[in-house]
């Protein structure tokens, strides 16, 4: 199987790209770059400029946010997952650090190719909004849980 066909097959399985026809996926794969990482290598770091997003072709990576108390793991991502889109959508520095936890193959999708795809296929934009809304919901649940635990600790310590 050719590398381009393999990339298109993987892109077809990415939920965000499910409604995109094969010729457009082939063009996206052709205009993107396969980048390989070894375990423990960093794809990008929190605070870096965001000029691309990545589709995980194979392997796994961990997503971390840096805090004053050290890094916090936010998620583990694997084949067909998409990372790095927030920085290019919002034109902000990277909001997290992504580190390969195994040998990793990615498809690096540049900002222009990404926006061309979203322009031509609005359902991709809707899919991205849905994924971001899901992540925000999960973050809100986590924040609520942590806030509740903090309040409980304060009450137990007599500081509330």
Segments (PLM) and residue ranges:
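Cytosolic regulatory regions built on CNB/CRP/Popeye-like sensor folds
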Residues: 1-160
């Amino acid at each position: 199987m050719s590398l381009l066909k393999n990339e298109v097959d993987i892109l077809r399985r990415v939920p965000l790209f499910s409604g995109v026809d094969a010729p457009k996926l082939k063009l996206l794969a052709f205009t993107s770059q396969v980048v390989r990482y070894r375990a423990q290598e960093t794809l990008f770091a929190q605070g870096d400029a965001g000029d691309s997003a990545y589709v995980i072709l194979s392997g796994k990576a961990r997503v971390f946010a840096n805090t004053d108390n050290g890094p916090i793991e936010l998620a583990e991502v694997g084949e067909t997952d998409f990372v790095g889109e927030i920085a290019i959508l919002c034109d902000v520095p990277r909001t997290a650090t992504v580190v390969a936890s195994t040998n990793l193959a990615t498809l690096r999708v540049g900002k222009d190719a990404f926006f061309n795809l979203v322009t031509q296929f609005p359902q991709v934009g809707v899919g991205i909004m849905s994924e971001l809304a899901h992540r925000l919901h999960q973050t809100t649940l986590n924040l609520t849980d942590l806030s509740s635990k903090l309040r409980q600790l304060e009450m137990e310590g007599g500081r509330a």
